[in-house]
Amino acid sequence: MSGSGLYPRYADLRRTVLDVAASSHNYLLNMIGHFGWLDAPVPPETSIAWYMVGGSLLLLGFAVWATARQKAALALLALAVIGAPFVLQLPTAASVGLVWQGRYALPIAIGLPLVAAVLISQASSDVEELVRRIVRAGVPILVVGHVAAFWWASRQYSEGLGGDLTTLAPHWSSPIGYLTGVGLYALVTCCLGYLIWHASRAAPAPTQTSALPAAG
């Protein structure tokens, strides 16, 4: 039995390309996180946090000085993440539909921030202070995004996505409790975030030592 022609809509190449392109934002959201299945995405705060921090890292990676080969590596990774849904779905869309999920691209996408970080680490000292400021601004944003995601997932399992945000009597909870678990996660995440934030502060200026010999 053949599945050919099950999706006649996608026999039209132009329509298929447009539909895949229209799904690009959903693919990006899926890379950031879905809880359970595709009907339970992370809260907007988490998505915005990753957009801001990840986008800043990539833009800075493209902006700093680097060799043509290094810039090409970063650009090819970005093109691979964007182009994979098109290349892998267009030949079979009419038979199986559009089945791509953003998480399928994660093995490639994880290389984007890593390569960008390598390029930034090789940049001149002129951008060092800018990088430090981005890190110190980005860490609190990511902490908020992570805590929001954990809270959202806990709420889904305790009350459902339509349930109360801060109920003290959830339909289900872990042994440590719904809000207790969220609070503990927030505490640990904030502590780790503070350690990273504190480590990224500017190094103290070297003290001037006198070149004069000691009296006596």
Q: Over which residues does each language-model region extend?
A:
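Helix-to-loop transition at the C-terminal end of transmembrane segments
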Residues: M1-R14, A94-V96, W152-G160
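Membrane-lumen/periplasm interface segments of multi-pass, membrane-embedded glycan/lipid transferases
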Residues: M1-W65, I120, T166-A186
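Structural signal for the C-terminal ends of transmembrane alpha-helices
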Residues: L57-R69, A116-S125, Y194-R201
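Membrane-interface helix-loop-helix junctions at transmembrane boundaries of multi-pass membrane enzymes
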Residues: L59-L79, V131-R133, A203
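Transmembrane alpha-helix segments characteristic
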Residues: R69-T92, I141-A148, A211-A215
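Membrane-interface interhelical loops and short amphipathic "cap" helices
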Residues: L90-W100, G160-A169
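Hydrophobic/aromatic-rich transmembrane helices and adjacent perimembrane loops
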Residues: G97-A117
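Transmembrane helical bundles and short interhelical boundary loops of multi-pass, membrane-embedded
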Residues: V131-G216
